[in-house]
């Protein structure tokens, strides 16, 4: 028998049914959580063995924010807006403000900075709300210009898309109900653990906790609903995401253990648009220089994750 469903579960589920958009444009929505959890199977993916996953394309010369005729950035400017794939239900990173209706967060601030660099106006963007599993697809199909959705830079993803330099280093942890007998990664055997489908969190769970029973959902909010309904025993994901979930549910807690992975976030760009990657890296360098990265971290993440260790140093040298 399922444990009692807390009232918050119904609130969260109801919010998920609302259509979401941004900047006056609404072309998609956040899927509702699954009616039944999807149990995943298959062999755990092998640990990644490449040593250059953080290496990106260096910004261009003396004017990294130049927009040459015929460039990807020029095409975006002619269109009149930047199109970005984002989350709209990941509190602190990309979520709808219930008062203003705007989708906002740490990841959204990067979209604004890219739009500002192209148009001189940080509001010239359209947000396409996507699930974690759709991040590669929308880039491969050129449905968006960038994806800013807490996406870990991995060797496998480099095979189908391109990444900016690392803009944040997260780490994977575990969230449980208060009073749970789960104390860490080594106590997950026999427990149902939720992670969004198509994420490195799910891959890491399969590899590092083979005795756990993995359960997939469209997003972490869907996992939270399953936890509240008693259909899963724990959620695993990046510390940034879990901090956002715990801040919304007084019965949830992130286990006080060291992160068991490193999850470097990058801005995703279509693989054939190297000029756009260089441009985005120029934007990131500008955020380092003018303090806007630190300001964004202080606003969104510092209250929950503590003082920043600083914007990650970029690694360049990748060639097309």
Q: Residue spans of the language-model regions?
A:
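C-terminal motif of bacterial Sec signal peptides marking the signal peptidase cleavage site
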Residues: 18-22
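Bacterial lipoprotein signal-peptidase II cleavage site
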Residues: 23-32
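Extracytoplasmic small-molecule ligand-binding "clamshell" domains
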Residues: 33-147
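Extended ligand-binding regions for polar small-molecule ligands
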Residues: 39-67, 199, 267-305
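Short loop->beta-strand "edge-of-pocket" segments that line small-molecule binding or catalytic clefts
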Residues: 83-86, 104, 185-199
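Acidic, polar ligand-binding/catalytic clefts
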Residues: 112, 116, 124-187
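A ligand-binding cleft/hinge motif common to bilobed small-molecule-binding domains
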Residues: 134, 150-159, 228-262
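Periplasmic-binding protein-like
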Residues: 168-176, 243-284, 304-320
């Amino acid at each position: 028998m399922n444990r009692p469903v807390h009232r918050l579960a119904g609130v969260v589920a109801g919010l998920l049914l609302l259509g979401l958009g941004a900047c006056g444009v609404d072309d998609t929505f956040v899927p509702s959580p699954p009616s039944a959890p999807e149990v995943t199977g298959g062999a755990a993916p092998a640990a990644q063995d490449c040593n250059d996953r953080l290496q990106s394309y260096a910004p261009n010369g003396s004017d990294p924010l130049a927009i040459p005729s015929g460039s990807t950035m020029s095409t975006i400017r002619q269109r009149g807006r930047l199109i970005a794939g984002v989350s709209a239900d990941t509190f602190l990173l990309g979520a709808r403000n219930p008062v203003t209706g705007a989708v906002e967060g740490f990841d959204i601030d990067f979209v604004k900075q890219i739009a500002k660099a192209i148009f001189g106006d940080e509001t010239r963007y359209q947000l396409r709300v996507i699930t974690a599993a759709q991040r590669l697809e929308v880039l491969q199909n050129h449905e968006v210009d960038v994806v800013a959705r807490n996406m870990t830079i991995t060797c496998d993803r480099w095979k189908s898309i391109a990444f900016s330099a690392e803009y944040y280093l997260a780490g994977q942890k575990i969230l449980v109900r208060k009073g749970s007998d789960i104390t860490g990664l080594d106590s997950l055997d026999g427990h149902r653990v939720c992670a969004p489908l198509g994420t490195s969190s799910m891959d890491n769970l399969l590899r590092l906790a083979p005795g756990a029973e993995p359960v997939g959902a469209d997003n972490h909010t869907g996992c939270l609903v399953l936890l509240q309904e008693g259909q899963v025993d724990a959620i695993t994901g990046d510390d940034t995401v879990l901090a956002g979930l715990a801040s919304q549910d007084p019965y949830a807690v992130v286990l006080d253990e060291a992160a068991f992975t490193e999850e470097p976030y990058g801005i995703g760009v279509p693989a054939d648009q190297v000029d756009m990657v260089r441009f985005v890296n120029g934007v990131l360098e500008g955020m380092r220089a003018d303090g806007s990265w630190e300001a964004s971290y202080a606003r969104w993440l510092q209250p929950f994750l503590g003082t920043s260790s600083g914007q990650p140093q970029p690694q360049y040298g990748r060639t097309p």
